[in-house]
């Protein structure tokens, strides 16, 4: 859904997970965007993101670019690769989705792209603080001066949720499974989601 010509100053990459949902609650961006890049759990991500945006009265859009044949690991429905240290590792995934969102919003007046990355999700190189600093430098160097920021990168998910205190009903919409549209309850992301919600609420 397009935002009706409105010029978004701040844009949130909304995956439908706990971290980006909490960031939507704390920062109330002008626009939220979910990217369908061919991941196996995309239907649930889009549904969760739409419900989160609706509850917070935020604009929500979906970008579709099928890159499944370039993916790897459980998120692409394929075998994991030795290059990554987790079964869901997808090469250059965060670089891909950030670039796709940036391409869509930079010419519409956006100046800040918010990413829901946290301290305890830095097992992949593209989840580390250094990565987001490099992406910020890369995008701001180019036309449009779009900045990338990960406001919760120094906090764990549990710390971030406790500090932000979003309503449980909001996080109830979230979907974190990296294997399917129905939460498997067994992958790292499902277990983390359940652990955080149990401890906080």
Describe each model-derived feature in a short phrase:
Residues 2-201:
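Nucleotide-activated chemistry modules centered on ATP-dependent adenylation/adenylyltransferase
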């Amino acid at each position: 859904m397009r935002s009706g010509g409105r010029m978004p100053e701040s844009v949130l990459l909304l995956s439908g997970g706990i971290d980006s949902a909490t960031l939507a609650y704390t920062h109330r961006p002008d626009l939220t965007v979910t990217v369908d890049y061919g991941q196996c759990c995309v239907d649930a991500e889009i549904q969760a993101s739409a419900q989160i945006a609706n509850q917070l009265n935020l604009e929500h859009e979906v970008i579709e670019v099928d890159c499944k044949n370039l993916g790897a690991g459980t998120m692409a429905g394929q075998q994991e690769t030795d290059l990554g240290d987790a079964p869901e590792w997808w090469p250059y995934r965060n670089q891909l989705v950030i670039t796709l969102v940036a391409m869509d919003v930079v010419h519409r007046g956006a100046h800040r792209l918010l990413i829901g990355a946290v301290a305890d999700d830095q097992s992949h190189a593209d989840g580390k603080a250094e990565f987001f600093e490099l992406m910020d430098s890369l995008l701001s160097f180019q036309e449009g001066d779009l900045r990338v920021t990960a406001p919760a990168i120094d906090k764990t998910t549990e710390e971030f949720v406790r500090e932000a205190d979003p309503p449980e009903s909001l996080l109830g919409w979230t979907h974190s499974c990296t294997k399917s549209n129905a939460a498997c309850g067994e992958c790292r992301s499902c277990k983390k989601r359940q652990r955080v919600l149990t401890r906080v609420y």
